[in-house]
């Protein structure tokens, strides 16, 4: 048909370059998609539409497949074209029934009031720590028996990495 452009989402050259550099010499296997989505999320604090399209191209998978996987999981922050970049830090507050009963809704409201838009505060699905509810996740660090002060302390200390047991 001789189209002057390809069908579908047009790739952004800088995004293609960034994703290619980020993946380096890692294999472009379909079963590594989630791992690479985590890599993009951790590097850029979000997954832009341009980066998602570039990843799909790099891995030679349909854009729809990459998008479906990225948007299925609550931990990935997928931005649509034109969306403003997210704040540098996200605090996720567990919304499981147990966390709700232990005050998660009030915790969410208190944190949102305190941080305004400087730190992104969002609801999150169950984090599997019902025995220490309510739970909040600062970056990748879980604050158990979370209170506004405990979460603020983790944010202030930039305690954003997971703790691994000895």
Enumerate the predicted regions with their spans.
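Feature of Fe-S/electron-transfer and energy-metabolism proteins
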Residues: 1-166
């Amino acid at each position: 048909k001789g189209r002057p452009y390809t069908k579908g989402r047009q790739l952004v050259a800088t995004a293609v370059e960034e994703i290619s550099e980020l993946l380096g010499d890692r294999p472009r296997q379909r079963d590594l998609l989630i791992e690479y989505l985590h890599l993009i999320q951790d590097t850029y604090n979000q997954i832009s539409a341009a980066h998602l399209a570039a990843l799909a191209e790099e891995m030679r998978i349909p854009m729809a497949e990459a998008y479906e996987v990225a948007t299925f999981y609550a931990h990935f922050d997928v931005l649509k074209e034109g969306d403003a970049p997210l704040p540098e830090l996200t605090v996720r507050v567990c919304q499981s029934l147990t966390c709700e009963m232990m005050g998660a809704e009030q915790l969410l409201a208190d944190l949102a009031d305190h941080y305004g838009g400087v730190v992104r505060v969002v609801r999150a699905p169950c984090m599997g720590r019902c025995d220490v509810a309510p739970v909040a996740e600062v970056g990748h660090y879980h604050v158990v028996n979370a209170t506004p002060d405990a979460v603020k302390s983790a944010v202030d200390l930039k305690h954003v990495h997971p703790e691994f047991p000895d």
